[in-house]
Amino acid sequence: MDFEKMKQWMEFAQQMYGGDFWKQVFDEDQKTPFMTNGQSPFPFAQQDQRGKGDASFPSMDIVDTVAEVQFLIYLPGYRKQDVHILSYGDYLVVKGQRFSYFNEQDFRQKEGKYGSFEKKIPLSDHLHGKMNAIFKDGILYITIQKDEGQAKTIVIDD
């Protein structure tokens, strides 16, 4: 069986019948235990061919201390120049793009993340302090100082 032709047929079927095509083909009870490890059991569900990508990518840890909040965003294979951070007050947007150096038809197996991504990170009200970012070893560290503001005296009325 020619894998490339099968892949093209599957992509065509998904485009014609929408993103839920494979969910309609396979029953929920047909999933085996090894298919329920956090990944979708349906072919191509993690990489939408229309450019939306995997909503869970990139994975992220959040560390909340007394003075700051640190976001650790895991971007294996990405370089600093592939990634951009935008601050919109109530949220951050981390986006990037990475391309393969190989021709698509030369892949026998392809599990790496290629193409573009965008992750929106909501921020709580007290996160409006100084921000800085470091990219090291495929991990983007974004640190935001907590801004608790100045204490205000509240007068107690009689």
UniProtKB/Swiss-Prot annotation:
The record's annotation in PROSITE patterns points to: SHSP
Q: Give the signal peptide, or none.
A: none
Keywords, alphabetical: Cytoplasm, Stress response
Protein species of origin: Bacillus subtilis (strain 168)
Quaternary form? Forms homodimers, homotetramers and higher oligomers.
Which gene is this protein's source? Answer: yocM
Q: Give the family this protein belongs to, as stated in its UniProt record.
A: Belongs to the small heat shock protein (HSP20) family.
* RNA-binding listed as a keyword: no
Write down what this protein is called. Salt stress-responsive protein YocM
Its primary localisation, in coarse terms, equals: cytoplasm
Show the InterPro entries listed in the entry.
A-crystallin/Hsp20_dom, HSP20-like_chaperone
Phenotype upon knockout? Deletion of the gene increases sensitivity toward salt stress.
A GO-annotated cellular component:
cytoplasm
* SUPFAM superfamilies the record matches: HSP20-like chaperones (SSF49764)
Where in the cell does this protein reside?
Cytoplasm
Say what the protein does: Part of the cellular protein quality control system with a specific role in salt stress response. May facilitate protein homeostasis, together with chemical chaperones that accumulate during the salt stress response. Increased levels of YocM protects against both heat and salt stress. In vitro, displays an unusual aggregase chaperone activity.
Q: Where is the sHSP domain?
A: 51-158
